[in-house]
Amino acid sequence: MKNKYYPLRSSMDEMSAKNDNEIDLEKGPLPEYNSEDGSTLPPYSDLNNPKQMGQNITKLFNWNKSTTPPDYDENRLPITDEGNNPPNTHRENHSSGTTDNSSPFLIKLLISFTSIILFNAPAVCYLKYKDAFFKNYGAAEWTLFGFWCLVCTLALLFLTYFYETWSKAVKVTIIFLAQCIKVTAVFLAQCVKVTAISLAKCVKVTAVGLYNSREKWVVIIWLLWVVICYTLFLRSKFGNLNLNKALICSTCSISAALLLFLLYVRLPFWTLKHMFSGLFQVLGVQSCVVIVTKGLMHLFDKHIDATGYEIEVSSLFVIGNFLFFYEMECPGALRRMPKSIRNGIASFLEGTGRAIRGANDNNNSIPLEETEAESEV
């Protein structure tokens, strides 16, 4: 019973009969199949389990569907199996020829004509601006106009005929210019960034140096600022610098702001509020002095000349900086100043009163006999 081949009655036998028992040269002759023990696999089978043969055959030949060929006619398309067929297998064969990607002639002509119009637009605008467009034309002007029309016509024909060439050249040029602009913008942005970082580092180093500097450096810088202010005064006096007197007055009277920033980098942050308070108090005192001075001059119908302005500016500058220094050294001094002034005036009046009362007391303490003797003499 062994090594006997029982052929399967299926479509496989029909296929083998049609092929006239052809042998696959790559896989060799067909092995014998033993149906009893199943030791030998079916021919050219890739399955390890013979029981899966039926499933493979069912999948191969699709027993669940009709094996009859579809009815092809002119008005009916064949029914395809979307699940078994791979996508995009149906391709149309266009045998009519290759498509032409070139632009139509009218579009070429229109684009070329537009280019010539744009090229001539500046000249037309200039002639319209000069009011010389088709006005007072002689033989020479009309000859030039006709020659220019001929040149434009030839240019139109040339641009239309060589449209692909010059359009590609223009496109490449525009792309190149755009890339150049982009690279330039990136380079400028990097330059600005590097410059800003360098300036920030310089400012930081300067601020740290001022913060760690001693008080004498602050005084030296302050003295330099005073020299600059008085240089402005001298140049304004001799006419080398035509500045408004009020501008000089306001600028130099609040010059203590420089000291404010110098002290800000040297002192802790919490003193900034005190600095602003002292500065505004000094400005208030200076404003009061200016208002009183102007009021008195207007009351007595007097005018301040250039020398008077210089005296006023110098006085305000000295008084303002002195008050600011005093306020920074003794916090709250300006607030206590009215009280101190009142106390000083009261002390002065009290001393004057005591002196007057002392003189009266001395006169009252003279004996009567001495007064009579003096009267007799």
Swiss-Prot record:
Question: What spans are recorded as compositionally biased (Basic and acidic residues)?
Answer: 11-29
Give GO cellular component annotations, separated by semicolons. ascus epiplasm; endoplasmic reticulum membrane; vacuolar membrane
Q: Which InterPro entries does the entry mention?
A: WTF
Chain intervals for the UniProt region annotation (Disordered): 1-49, 64-100
In this record, what's one Pfam family?
Answer: WTF
Q: Where are the transmembrane segments?
A: 105-125, 142-162, 172-192, 218-238, 252-272, 276-296, 306-326
Query: Null-mutant phenotype, please?
Result: Abnormal spore maturation in presence of cw9-encoded poison. Sensitises cells to cw9-encoded poison; simultaneous disruption of cw27 enhances sensitivity.
Q: Which UniProt keywords apply?
A: Cytoplasm, Endoplasmic reticulum, Membrane, Toxin, Transmembrane, Transmembrane helix, Vacuole
Q: Name one GO biological process term.
A: meiotic drive
Question: How is the quaternary structure described?
Answer: Homomer. Forms protein aggregates. The two isoforms can interact with each other and with themselves. High sequence similarity is required for their interaction.
Q: Briefly, what is this protein's role?
A: Promotes unequal transmission of alleles from the parental zygote to progeny spores by acting as poison/antidote system where the poison and antidote proteins are produced from the same locus; the poison component is trans-acting and targets all spores within an ascus whereas the antidote component is spore-specific, leading to poisoning of all progeny that do not inherit the allele.
Q: Which family does it belong to?
A: Belongs to the WTF family.
Query: What is this protein identified as?
Result: Meiotic driver cw9
